[in-house]
């Protein structure tokens, strides 16, 4: 299980990404627009660099909702592979059945 502080850090990052998402998208659009002048694109890049480090979506990590495990997490369920297995065998995940062919 991941420490509670790790889970809280990830939650804080998600909130920062959501807070700065609009500004981030606007600046990225300016930077990637070839029709803009070099000076405008340069100032947009400087403004992007002044955003908080944790405001970048690339710093987010998918974690298991139950354990906080960072690897082996399925997006569909939001759970780690071992927790999916446990819950599926108990029958707690609707529609998931053991495969047989």
Swiss-Prot record:
The keyword Ribonucleoprotein applies. Signal peptide: none annotated. Coiled coil: none annotated. One of its GO terms (biological process) is translation. Transmembrane segments: none annotated. GO terms for molecular function: rRNA binding; structural constituent of ribosome. SUPFAM superfamilies: Glucocorticoid receptor-like (DNA-binding domain) (SSF57716). InterPro entries: Ribosomal_uS14 (IPR001209), Ribosomal_uS14_bac/plastid (IPR023036). It holds the Pfam family Ribosomal_S14. Keywords: Ribonucleoprotein, Ribosomal protein, RNA-binding, rRNA-binding. It comes from the Bacteria. One of its GO terms (cellular component) is small ribosomal subunit. NCBIfam families: PRK08881.1. Belongs to the universal ribosomal protein uS14 family. Part of the 30S ribosomal subunit. Contacts proteins S3 and S10. Binds 16S rRNA, required for the assembly of 30S particles and may also be responsible for determining the conformation of the 16S rRNA at the A site. This is Small ribosomal subunit protein uS14. The gene is rpsN.
